[in-house]
A protein has these predicted regions:
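Short alpha-helix carrying the canonical HExxH Zn2+-binding catalytic motif
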Residues: 1-9
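Zinc-dependent metallohydrolase catalytic domains
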Residues: 8-156
Length: 156
């Protein structure tokens, strides 16, 4: 649900006002900040290249709306989960829902045409921007997915 709510504020949904009218309602500063953050997210996803050819990579522009939805969705779900605990100890919830196995041809086609990032990047590309993930799993700079705090993206 959080992912779908996030679409209301992604690269497309953010172009409509609160009544659904297509108009620019952003201040110049807010729009510049949004573009800087989404540009950084595009760059992160453009760097996900599952094959050694260096040519078949996730298209960060094509997948931007879905990646924003995933990023916002995780943040909303995490906050809602902690509210539901009412002070009780939390349990670790992982990303197994996105486990998959794809043939190379299908994966290459997906990266050219599908606005959704491949499953492993829908998980790894999002959690590496989420400070709470580092705390929950003790992620340190020697981990492959580690991003320095100043490179982590939080749009909302």
């Amino acid at each position: 649900i959080g992912h779908e709510i996030g679409h209301g504020f992604d690269d497309q949904g953010s172009k409509s006002d609160g009544t659904g009218m297509l108009r620019n309602w952003w201040t110049a500063e807010d729009e510049a900040n949004f573009k800087a953050k989404t540009g950084a997210l595009v760059a992160q996803y453009n760097a996900f290249c599952p094959y050694d050819d260096g040519e078949t990579c996730v298209n960060g522009v094509l997948t931007l709306g879905e990646n924003i939805g995933d990023l916002g969705g995780l943040s909303m779900a995490y906050k809602a989960y902690h509210l539901s605990l009412n002070g009780k100890e939390d349990k670790v919830i992982d990303g197994q829902v996105w486990r998959s196995k794809n043939r190379e041809e299908a994966m290459r086609r997906q990266m050219l045409t599908d606005p959704h990032s491949p499953p492993q990047y829908r998980v790894n590309g999002i959690v590496r921007n989420f400070d709470e993930w580092y705390e929950a799993f003790g992620i340190t700079p020697d981990n492959e997915l580690y991003l320095p705090p100043e490179q982590r993206i939080r749009i909302w």
